[in-house]
Amino acid sequence: DRAQVLAAMKRATTFMVEKVANKGGYVWSYLPDMTRRWGEMEATPTMIWIQPPGTPSMGHLFLDAYHATGDDHYYRAAEQVASALMFAQHPSGGWNYIADFAGEASLKKWYDPIGKNAWRLEEFQHYYGNATFDDAGTAESAKFFLRLYVEKKDPKYKAPLDKAIKFVLDSQYPIGVWPQRFPKAQAAGLHGLPDYTSYATFNDDVAAENMDFLLMCYQ
């Protein structure tokens, strides 16, 4: 019945927030004893994943639960996600696939043994130091901040939202499309090939996700 469903939801959320989350952030999957964890690739204990179904996806889930129940327990869980995403937000306003609470040096160290050996995942093979539109990580995070801000108009969520909006507008090319990564990386080509991440990108619904976010902002 409804009471059992609500109790199960709260138990699951409490487990995720208290036992699984890393300062409000998440990866994709974990061993039962939490000794290893993965996003699209294996992560270190200090890392979180932005790329769905990672941290922003959990934020949307908590907001959905809050809307369904009116229980602030879920809103507070969403706020913890927001804290992690504010840490992970690039100064330009977008997000990378991943973030590391241990700092940039630790993140760069991850790229050496793990990222650079990412077969078929070329974008993980180099630390670009910028943000990506690939796989909707930036779009999911931006939409989450929009929803969170609109919910209670808490001013602390207006700044990351405004930065995300500016990022999407600043990175759009005059013909209307977006690159895969922004700001433009310098000398970032792989395997002797020119860098492709500044090219107009339609893969993984880059343009569609950005347009959807902007339409949500307008509405």
Question: Where does each model-flagged region fall?
Answer:
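Mature N-terminal segment immediately following signal peptide/propeptide cleavage
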Residues: 2-24
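Extended ligand-binding groove/face enriched in aromatic
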Residues: 19-218
